[in-house]
Amino acid sequence: SDFYYLTHFPEPEAVVVLVPGREHGEYILFCRERSPEKETWEGRRAGLDGARELYGADDAFPIDDIDEILPGLLENREKVFYSMGRDADFDVHLMGWVNEVRAKARNGVHAPGEFVDLNHMLHEMRLFKGADEIKLMRRAAKISSAAHRRAMQVCRPGKMEYEIEAELWYEFKKGGSQFPAYPAIVGGGANSCILHYNENNA
């Protein structure tokens, strides 16, 4: 959710890089390119132009080119702000890119010497809400409230858990929500005593 908070970019296989003071723009997005064949089956993609035009990226590159481009963005930077440990595979890639930059030390290129945990900084930022965020949160609360009222109205003996869950999701979608902020816990009978029950299949 931190990636979405920073970019509002909804597609998979994407990486955001923020480079303070970069001449060609500070907000860089690596993402999938447009592909008519794949979009026929998987849905539309923003592509590089969409990343810039729709999501405000200063620069956008194909995700397949990240190994060639990202090491250059790390050159002569003192620090890397990153959430280490969240994605083990990406951690390995990042360390590989940093080592690639270190290998250029004889040419006068400096690698970042410090990693700073991004989680703390981002979560601190997210504590403070702007007017637009507050408006959005109020709207989300109204949608959630309507969905829970609907779930309570349809709840009857003999009703299956998944039927009640479906009513909840229906109301979320009807209210304009793209996806739920939390999983549904719909437990009947003995399942109602399980705190984080989410099978919802009885």
Per-segment meaning from a language model:
Residues F3-Y4, I69, K173-K174, H196-N200:
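Generic recognition of flexible, low-complexity loop/linker segments
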Residues E37, A88-F90, E171, S192-L195:
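Flexible loop/turn segments at secondary-structure boundaries
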Residues S1-A146:
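A composition/biophysics-driven feature that prefers long, compositionally simple stretches
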Residues R126-Y182:
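Active-site pocket-lining segments that scaffold enzyme catalytic pockets across diverse folds
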